[in-house]
């Protein structure tokens, strides 16, 4: 009876540390499981190793369970005492076997090294008294359903080496056991109620399978691990976890697996897909999506396009964000011409060409304010602060005026292409001083009106630049209400300077040392600027020098179409210059655009001839210069017979028209040189064209009078 009491006392001491160790079993999901079989087959690997050590068998740390059982049986058979294995097994397994019957078998994978060492020492001491305890231990082994004896107060105290791991496992089990099944399993461990523990273990395993399914599929990526979680847990804890004596590798693997399980449980508690909320969690990707607070209508951090991206795009066209201006911002006023490109716009502050001080304008601001290419804008930009990253272009933060008016007034403007064009009706008189014969001759042979589309056909070195300057000065002197724009494309720099100093108007230039793209950019922006002024009802006069060089620039800058005309001219290169020249018109309800362009001829280039042929029939006024007269230093070298204006009867009065026709008859009968010399001589004798025409009327006989 004393031997039995000693054996029960040993089991009570071992059981005192077992509840804290086994408390983590509900959290890990293994559940309590009954011992299968009796005798050596019903023991776990650690118990078999202790039995083998009691029999004096060495080298059992690397043996499998089946091998260890065979070695023990052989040792028992060789020693002739098969019953001796039972007392040793009772001494070693009696410490934990009642506990294992009522709870879980996951103790050995989580045992601390100190606990293992203590057990090994106890097993060696009790090997000597195995014979004395044989009957009692054999009785314990043969009764698998024996309940665990109650633990007294003295046995409840465990070693510090056992308390630390079990305390950590208890806290982990408490924090992870959030489901009702886990709570029931914990209660079952505390009360040692074997039926309740057996029923709660499948529930706990099922809860872990549902909660950890999606998260573990992302972390481990194996479908086989999700098939049978309970079998995998039993195998890990029964076979792999029970090899604690093989070294620290098994302990580290078990602890790492516990940490992964804990992380998976915490991830599942974080949230998951909406359609899997009943499972306790979802995938990592959906959890991050919900944690960030984004839905399908918003734009998440991961750049997801969203289900309603088409509707959001349509709303974005109308919902324009205004630039925010703070109180401490320093605003700098800006002004310039708006140039709208494909995806953005700029205010050209330094002229009509791109510059480093241009101001960026978003397309949202363009659409909101109804801005168009060529508008003159005034506004403000924000001055960069110290330490602030400086952008390449400052953005427009405030729009003050559009073409001198409030921004809201520019939305209802008519479109230039929808305006009704008419023949010129209001005459632009170019006569100024009596000594300036160039403008006086133009008024006589080729009168110009508002909305005229005139072509100055000029061979090289015929004085076309001087004629352009004279026309520009005459327009600014006699018609100050007209907005004058002189566009010089592919010209010499000194001519640009001379034109800027001699003309009181807007000179827009792109010299020949610049690329062809600059020539086309300047011309397009200039004509768009003129159109915007015409839409407002202004009269605009554009002097272009020359349209031939503009056609050359488009031929170089425009992409090749594959259809090459005579002279190497691309078929698509002639349309932009024709669009430029065709913009001249007289508007029915007010406003006009007059364009006088020069065309080069007799240059020896087939390309120039092709370009001139395209424009020869497009104008309604033509002033032709002659190279022979220029070679003889007769200026202005105007070919009187070849020059003229269509529908000149609209611009001239009846009396003036009749006298002009008489003059043309007289000059037509003379040679070209004689005609211009006679005309210049008679005009020098008079102070004005009106006086000259009266003199012509008196001296020239009327046809049909018989004189």
Swiss-Prot record:
Q: Where are the membrane-spanning stretches?
A: none
Q: Does the keyword Transcription apply?
A: yes
SUPFAM superfamilies found in the cross-reference section: Nucleic acid-binding proteins (SSF50249), P-loop containing nucleoside triphosphate hydrolases (SSF52540), Rho N-terminal domain-like (SSF68912)
Q: Which parts of the sequence belong to the Rho RNA-BD domain?
A: 331-406
Which UniProt key words apply to this protein?
ATP-binding, Helicase, Hydrolase, Nucleotide-binding, RNA-binding, Transcription, Transcription regulation, Transcription termination
Q: Which GO terms describe its biological process?
A: DNA-templated transcription termination
Q: What ranges does the record list as Basic residues composition bias?
A: 301-315
Biased-composition ranges for Polar residues? 176-188
List the biased-composition ranges (Low complexity): 16-31, 76-93, 153-163, 203-213
Q: Which residues bind ATP?
A: 449-454, 461-466, 492
Spell out the Basic and acidic residues composition-biased ranges. Answer: 107-132, 215-265
Q: Where is this region: Disordered?
A: 1-38, 76-321
EC id: 3.6.4.-
Subunit-structure text = Homohexamer. The homohexamer assembles into an open ring structure.
What family does the entry list? Answer: Belongs to the Rho family.
Q: Per its record, how is this protein called by name?
A: Transcription termination factor Rho
Species whose genome carries this gene: Streptomyces lividans
Gene for this chain: rho
């Amino acid at each position: 009876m004393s031997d039995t009491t000693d054996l029960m006392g040993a089991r009570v001491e071992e059981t005192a540390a077992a509840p804290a160790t086994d408390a983590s079993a509900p959290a890990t999901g293994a559940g309590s499981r009954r011992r299968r079989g009796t005798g050596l087959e019903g023991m776990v690997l650690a118990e078999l190793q202790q039995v083998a050590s009691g029999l004096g068998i060495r080298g059992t740390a690397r043996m499998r369970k089946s091998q260890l059982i065979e070695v023990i049986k052989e040792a028992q058979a060789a020693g002739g005492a098969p019953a001796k294995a039972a007392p040793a097994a009772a001494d070693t397994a009696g410490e934990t076997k009642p506990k294992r019957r009522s709870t879980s078998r996951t103790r050995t994978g989580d045992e601390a090294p100190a606990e293992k060492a203590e057990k090994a020492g106890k097993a060696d001491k009790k090997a000597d008294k195995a014979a004395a305890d044989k009957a009692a231990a054999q009785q314990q082994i043969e009764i698998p359903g024996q309940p665990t004896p109650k633990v007294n107060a003295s046995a409840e105290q465990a070693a510090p080496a056992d308390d630390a791991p079990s305390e950590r496992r208890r806290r982990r089990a408490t924090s992870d056991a959030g489901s009702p099944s886990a709570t029931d399993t914990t209660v079952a461990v505390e009360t040692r109620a074997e039926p309740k523990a057996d029923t709660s273990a499948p529930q706990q395993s099922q809860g872990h399978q549902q909660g950890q399914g999606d998260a573990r599929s992302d972390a481990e990526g194996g479908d086989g691990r999700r098939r049978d979680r309970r079998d995998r847990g039993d195998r890990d804890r029964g076979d792999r976890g029970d090899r604690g004596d093989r070294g620290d590798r098994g302990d580290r693997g078990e602890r790492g697996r516990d940490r992964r399980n804990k992380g998976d449980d915490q991830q599942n508690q974080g949230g998951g897909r909406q359609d899997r909320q009943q499972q306790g969690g979802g995938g990592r990707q959906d959890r991050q999506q919900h944690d960030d607070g984004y839905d399908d209508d918003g734009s998440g951090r991961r750049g997801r396009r969203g289900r309603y991206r088409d509707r959001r795009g349509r709303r974005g066209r109308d919902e324009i964000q205004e630039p925010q201006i703070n109180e401490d911002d320093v605003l700098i006023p800006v002004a310039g011409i708006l140039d709208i490109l494909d995806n953005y716009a700029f205010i050209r502050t330094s002229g009509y060409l791109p510059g480093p001080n241009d101001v960026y304008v978003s397309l949202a601001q363009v659409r909101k304010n109804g801005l168009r290419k060529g508008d003159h804008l005034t506004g403000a930009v924000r001055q960069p602060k110290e330490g602030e990253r400086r952008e390449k272009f400052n953005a427009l933060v405030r729009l003050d005026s559009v073409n001198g008016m409030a921004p809201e007034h520019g939305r209802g403007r008519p479109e230039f292409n929808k305006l009704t064009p008419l023949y010129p009706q209001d005459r632009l008189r170019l006569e100024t001083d009596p000594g300036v014969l160039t403008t006086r001759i133009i008024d006589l042979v080729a009168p110009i009106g508002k909305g005229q589309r005139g072509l100055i056909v000029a061979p090289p070195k015929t004085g076309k630049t001087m004629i352009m300057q004279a026309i520009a000065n005459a327009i600014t002197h006699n018609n100050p209400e007209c907005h004058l724009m002189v566009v010089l494309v592919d010209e010499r720099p000194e001519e640009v300077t001379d034109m800027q100093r001699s003309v009181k108007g807007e000179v827009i230039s792109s010299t020949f040392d610049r690329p062809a793209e600059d020539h086309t950019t300047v011309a397009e922006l200039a004509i768009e600027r003129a159109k915007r002024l015409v839409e407002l009802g202004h009269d605009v006069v554009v002097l272009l020098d020359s349209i031939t060089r503009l056609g050359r620039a488009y031929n170089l800058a425009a992409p090749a179409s594959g259809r090459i005309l005579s002279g190497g001219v691309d078929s698509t290169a002639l349309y932009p210059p024709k669009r430029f020249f065709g913009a001249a018109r007289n508007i029915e309800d007010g406003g006009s655009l007059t364009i006088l362009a020069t065309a080069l001829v007799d240059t020896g280039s087939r390309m120039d001839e092709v370009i001139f042929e395209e424009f020869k029939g497009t104008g309604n006024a033509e002033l032709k210069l002659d190279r022979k007269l220029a070679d003889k230093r007769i200026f202005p070298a105007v070919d009187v017979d070849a020059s003229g204006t269509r529908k000149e009867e609209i611009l001239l009065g009846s009396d003036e028209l009749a006298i002009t026709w008489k003059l043309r008859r007289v000059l037509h009968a003379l040679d070209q040189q004689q005609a211009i010399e006679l005309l210049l001589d008679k005009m020098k004798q008079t102070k004005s064209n009106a006086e000259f025409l009266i003199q012509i009327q008196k001296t020239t006989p009327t046809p049909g009078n018989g004189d």
